Amino acid sequence: MKFVDSVIINVSAGKGGDGCISFRREKFVPKGGPDGGNGGDGGNIWIVSNTNINTLTDYRIKKIFQSENGKNGLNSNRSGKNGKDIYIPVPLGTRIIDNDTKKIIIEILKINQKFLVAKGGKRGLGNTNFKSSINQTPRKKTYGTLGENKNILLELILIADIGTLGLPNSGKSTLITSMSNAKTKIDIYPFTTLIPILGTVKAKKKKFIIADIPGIIKNASLGIGLGIKFLKHLSRCKLLLHIIDITINKKKINKIRYIILKELKNFNKKLFQKTRWLIFNKIDLLKPKKISQIKKYIKKKIEKNKKYYFISAKKNIGIKKLSKDIIKYLYKKNKEYI
């Protein structure tokens, strides 16, 4: 299934029903007064959060939403029925944007969140409302007003605590699988992660959500590769894990770091400024002596305040400590977080 995280829809709320002009016409009441009822209000259109969906795929085809018009008023002071409301379910993390002005209207971030995106038109008034001491037989009514009509951009930005980034085949998917309950496709080919994937990690009786996006390559910000368009899904993360394949030539480690950093900076400065930990993966493929040499090299080259780990996602080496440290970091950032 294609991962759809951005779609434009049209929402058109119902028109209000018109008021009615009518007079009582009953036996023995030859000059009955006005009895025209009011119209009904037009139906509203609501955006509602739904935890059972995680993409906007449903709206690739269905793009127009029209709620019911209010019914016209009737005689005998009978009001027209209100138009039925429409509810549009979206995943948590969906941003609602006015596509004409490009203004963010609201972000859907809470369970059971509900937002009125297009209000139905107001009902028209029947002639009963215009009776007065000087006008006992009013022939006046008002018409229902039009409902709101908007072009809305729905943009999904995943909600995750931790995000992973790195070159293709650095082991991001293996790490997510090792740490969490996510099931990702793992191969030796580039771009085996084709869509963002979320996993839940439990450690020390607490848990966090971790996101994996397709690998980023050099010049990704110019449109090369797959990862750059999914970088927005890391914007809500509190911590980024930069995964590096330790089996490469040690002198290329910093070069690889800066490839990713450059693409981050080009994409979004706020994302570039997020806290990042370096995760050196695949230590199971090297002999202890080689690992020791690389550790010494990295200690010289990496900034003193930079946090880094040596792990094997495949062999589950160092994963437990990494998970615990992430929990500590998140808890320290916000004591009410977990």
UniProtKB/Swiss-Prot annotation:
GTP binds at residues 166-173, 191-195, 212-215, 281-284, 312-314. It is found in: Cytoplasm. The keyword Disulfide bond does not apply. GO terms for biological process: ribosome biogenesis. Its EC number is 3.6.5.-. Residues 160-331 form the OBG-type G domain. Its cofactor is Mg(2+). InterPro entries: G_OBG (IPR031167), GTP-bd (IPR006073), GTP-bd_Obg/CgtA (IPR014100), GTP1-OBG_CS (IPR006074), GTP1_OBG_dom (IPR006169), GTP1_OBG_dom_sf (IPR036726), OBG_GTPase (IPR045086), P-loop_NTPase (IPR027417). An essential GTPase which binds GTP, GDP and possibly (p)ppGpp with moderate affinity, with high nucleotide exchange rates and a fairly low GTP hydrolysis rate. Plays a role in control of the cell cycle, stress response, ribosome biogenesis and in those bacteria that undergo differentiation, in morphogenesis control. Monomer. This is GTPase Obg. It comes from Buchnera aphidicola subsp. Cinara cedri (strain Cc).
